[in-house]
Each structure stands twice: as structure tokens, then as C-alpha cells.
Amino acid sequence: MAKFISAKEAAKLIPDGSTVGVAGMGLAGWPEEVAVAIADNFKETGHPCNLTMKQGSAMGDWRERGMTRLGLEGLVTKWSAAHIGSAFAMNDLVRAEKMACHCLPQGVIVNLWREIAAKRPGLITKVGLGTFVDPRLEGGKMNKVTTEDLVELIEFNGEEYLFYKSFKLDVAMLRGTTADENGNITFENEGPINEGLAVAQAAKNSGGIVIVQVEYQALKNTLKPKDVKIPGALVDYVVVATDKNACWQTEGVYYEPAFAGNLRKPLSAIPILPLTERKVMARRAAMELSKGDLVNLGVGIPSDVASIVSEAGYIEEITMTTEIGGFGGIPASLPNFGSSYNAEANIDHGSMFDLYDGGGIDVAVLGLAQADEAGNINVSKFTIPGLGDRLTGPGGFINITQSTQKVVFAGSFNAKCEVEISDGKLIIKKEGRGKKLLKEVEQVTFSGKYAAENGQEILYVTERCVFKLINGKMTVIEIAPGIDLQKDILDQMDFTPAISADLKEMDSGLFSEKWDGLDTIMGK
């Protein structure tokens, strides 16, 4: 039977040098009160120290809550994650070479928990081949002090694969909504279900402990069995939070019932995007969808595609998914990314990546930080002139882009450029601080060569033009009205792209307040 303890008591249970696993995305699933207690105990006593943290997604609110709480020199000395951008204090230690850090694909980490639980040696997959995770490139190592090899290149039946090694998990640090007296955990106020069960099983079968923070305590035998997501037999300690600020559902909201499936929100209550270059790009990306498609949308501009489809009245014709397990409804943008308004179903994190890795979705729309002439994309480690280095990691980007037949990358042509939309045209008011279309990207998060070899359809949507990967080369296929090909596109790139013989103007309606561009596509 689980023991109910305080967060301070929980912090003292974590041994020095232990490996700690967490589950969730953003603040969803994050045990904030326990994390604060760990940091406080370290400040007071110097313990626990030399921890290795393992996480499958971004954990934090890009400010002070989340994994960044543990960003104290000596507290955590090794970090493996899919996304590290939202934990500023931890990120600073990585950039200062004071913490070793591996960034691995999100789907790899969340499914590696199951391999560990089953005491299998690791995960064999093609995900990551040709990217910075491939040991022939960087092996996922994000700085110079990271020397351990977590990924091996192997051959099986004459084909190349990557082997991601299992490890011993000492502590699972999780969150739910309610725990009964036996430690059974429900998630009724959470949005995504996440991978908490798999992490708990990995810890238990490694001989470790499972700590779960909840908001409420219930009498035993009062929870519905189908509502229990982590059985009490797997839980060692329960912390009932004393501060509601430790229980935020997402980075942006304490509790949104439509994210938890406890309310269906009218579509009229979901904000419509103003006409900006972001909306133009989201509209153009939406034109690559077809009726009946199963779709994944990435963070940033890609997540705005859901709003575009909803505004046009076709949200019932497309099934949107989120990496962490949402099916249907309208995926939310930051600061609520990962949750969905009015989802039809929520499955666990790892199962969603089984679908993605097997090519189960029709279209993916993801972000673009840097691109090069070979069609490679970098979103994981890059420099923005005037703003400095950005270490973010790939999130689910590698899994999704390598396994989906049609991928649309969407992002601004230059960093921090100023544009204006007037009379159905795009006007460049001021060029950006730095070029994003480079001779060679700083880090390969997506391999154009791998995509070309596998026959994927790849498009790159910016506010100025649209590129397509044709015969392994970036090719301009559309140009925005009001844009000069030479001055506004070619002169702003570090390489010369191919120009389609059938170069078209982007639909002028994309640059107008009213747009009916999805009507024909959806068969109205």
C-alpha cells in the first residue's frame, strides 16, 4: 500500500546519483511541489546530488516552473530529453558545459520506458537515421562534456537501424489528479494521459521507487477501475499537493475542462487568428490537407493550422492528433500545446508514437528554424543573430518527419523580419536579423536525403514563397503576391535553389481577411 507523505519527505527519499524519470508535457504531468522540495533540500543540505534526469518531452512553462526548478549546479549532472528548451536554468548549465546532455527523439524515450519495464536491452528503430542522433553525426550529444554513447548503429537483415540502450530507473516522479488510500491514481483533471504508467513500471521493475503527486485524496474502493491510470500496487509514495499552483494542467491554465474532456467547448469560444504572416503560412499549410486525413501539428505556426481548419468549418472533416495522445478536436497552441479542445479520445503517449512511427498519419505540419539546399531542417540547436544560441532538442520532430509520407514545414523566411499585408499582397518592411535558409544547417534534425530516398513528399511554406523537395533539391514552386523573386527571396538565401518551370503565385486569398481556400479541397 502506498504511503502518504509530504513533498519535503519525498525529496529526502531520492538517493544521490540516482536516475529519475518523469512523464508528461509542459506542466501536464509535472509534480511541481515535489520538484520545489528537491531543489530546496539541495540548497539546504547538498542532497540529492549528481542526479540523471530522463524525460520524454518539454517539461516546464518557459519561465520558472517545471524542470528548470532543478537547474542548480551539482543537483543534476546528466540530462536526457527530447526537448530541453523550456527549462532555462537547466539549459544554461548545458550551454556552460556544466551538465552532460543527450537529446533523443520523443517517441524513442517514451517507448524506451516499456523496454526497461520488460527488461529488454533497448529499442531498435530506424528513427534518427541520418539526423544528429545518428552516432555517425553527433549521437544526440548536445555539448562537449557529453561523452557517453547512448545510441549504436547496428545492421539487422541487411538494413541499418539505431539501437537505443535501456538503463536502470531508480525513481519515477509523476503526477495525477486523485489518489485513493491504496495509492490508485486517476487523471480526471489532466488533459493528456501521458506515459506515467510506463515510467512507473520501469521504476518498479528496476527495483526503484514511484512517487506520485496528486491534488486530491479519496477513500479506498471509491475510484472506478477504468479511471485508474496507475495502479496503487505500483505506487510507493503519494504527495497530496498543498498549493494549487503546483497542479497546473498546462503552462497556460490551472484547469480547462475542455482539455480534460469534462466539457465540450463551443467552437465560437475558440479565438480566431488575426490576419498576419503567421495566418498566411498556416492557411497555406492547411491547403495540403485532404478530407478524412489523420494529421499531426507541431508547435508554433503549425499549431495554428487547427484554428484555420476550425474557422473554415471543416474541423469535423480532419482528425488532428497530438504527440502526447490526443485524437480529434482542436489541438491547442502555446502555452497549452499538447492538450486539445474537445478531443474525441486520449491514448497514452507511447501508443501514439507507435502510430506515428508506423506511418499511420497522412500529413504532418511542423516548424522550420533553419533549412539548407539539401532540404535538411534544423529545429534542435541553432543560432539567431543578435539573440544567441538556442538549444531545444527535437521533441517528436524526428519520429514524425521520418515516418509520415507527406510533411509540410512552416516558418518565417528570415528570423525576426517585419512584414505587412495590404491589398492582398505581402510587403517586406524590414529584413530579419538572420537568414534561415543556409548553405548547411547547424544541426540535422530532418534529413532531406533520407526523405528523398524514401519517396516522401516534402514542402516548405514561408510567408514569401513555397519550396518543394524535388530530386533532392530545394525548389521554389510558389511566390507570394508583392514579392520580388530576386530581391526578396534569392538575395536573402545562402544558396541558390532550383526554380520550378511552372512557378506560380500563391493564392491571393491567403493574404485577405476572408478566405475560402479550403472549400474546394474539402469538397464543398
Curated annotation (Swiss-Prot):
Keywords: Transferase. The keyword Ribonucleoprotein does not apply. Coiled coil: none annotated. It catalyses: hydrocaffeoyl-CoA + (E)-caffeate = 3-(3,4-dihydroxyphenyl)propanoate + (E)-caffeoyl-CoA. Pfam families: CoA_trans. Induction: Induced by cinnamate and sinapate. Optimum pH is 7.5. Disulfide bonds: none annotated. Its EC number is 2.8.3.23. Homodimer. Involved in caffeate respiration, which consists in the reduction of the C-C double bond of caffeate. CarA catalyzes an energy-saving CoA loop for caffeate activation in the steady state of caffeate respiration. It catalyzes the formation of caffeyl-CoA from caffeate with hydrocaffeyl-CoA as the CoA donor via a ping-pong mechanism. In addition to caffeate, the enzyme can utilize 4-coumarate or ferulate as CoA acceptor. Neither acetyl-CoA nor butyryl-CoA served as the CoA donor. This is Caffeate CoA-transferase. It comes from Acetobacterium woodii. The lineage of its organism: Bacteria, Bacillati, Bacillota, Clostridia, Eubacteriales. The gene is carA.
